[in-house]
Amino acid sequence: MIEKFNLGLLDLLSILLPGGFLIGLAWQSGWLEDWPMLSGIPEGWASGAVFAASAYVLGHFIHMIASYLDELVFEKIKEKKWPDQTLVKEVVQIKDSEIGEIDRKHFNAFKWSLAYLMQHQPMMYQAVEKHIAESKFFRSFLIVLLVASLWAFVQQSWLEGLLSLGFAFLSLVRYATQRQKSIESAYQYVIAAKGKGRQA
């Protein structure tokens, strides 16, 4: 129960924090000061509620844009840094034996592994989901930091821009490593679970 709450909180923060950070950046730049929707809001809890709701909505758009990094960036990093296909080939064989051959574009080995663990090994699925949630957070934060660095350079704030780029690089590293951990963990858990099933 506590583990599910922690994962839910991490998922929420992966949406809320990047959105809140970007709204704060826009407010600091003066873009939102004359926005009609915000001019009539009183101080106090109402303004906080509007900020939280706006951050949540904006965070979803950031999440949607950031999801394209999986194919555009992560897959290229994976080919160079983690080229070994042993685990995925083993899982594909297990998947094909369970549900037959399906076009990988529609139902790849990773998606099937998550579905299998969710149905048959929920504790293993939660362990994988932790890596997924963390990778999503840093994936979204990477987009925010790139926007922040661009804004800083436009304002000729060179130090802030370089710092934002540095943190963006660290976010990219963390996103890629956690994404890879989630994939490897899912494959390993499926192989281990099927091995136990055969022994039983």
Predicted regions mapped to residue ranges:
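Charge-rich cytosolic interhelical loops and cytosolic tails of multi-pass membrane proteins
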Residues: 66-125
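N-terminal first transmembrane alpha-helix
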Residues: 1-88, 155, 173, 177-178, ...
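Alpha-helical oligomerization segments
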Residues: 162, 166-200
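Transmembrane alpha-helical segments and their cytosolic interface motifs
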Residues: 3-17, 118-162
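Short, flexible coil/linker elements and helix-boundary hinge sites characteristic
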Residues: 30, 80, 93, 121, ...
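A contiguous, surface-oriented mixed alpha/beta subdomain in the mid-to-C-terminal portion of proteins
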Residues: 103, 107-111, 137, 147-170, ...
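Charged/polar, solvent-exposed surface patches and flexible loops
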Residues: 71, 126, 130, 181-188
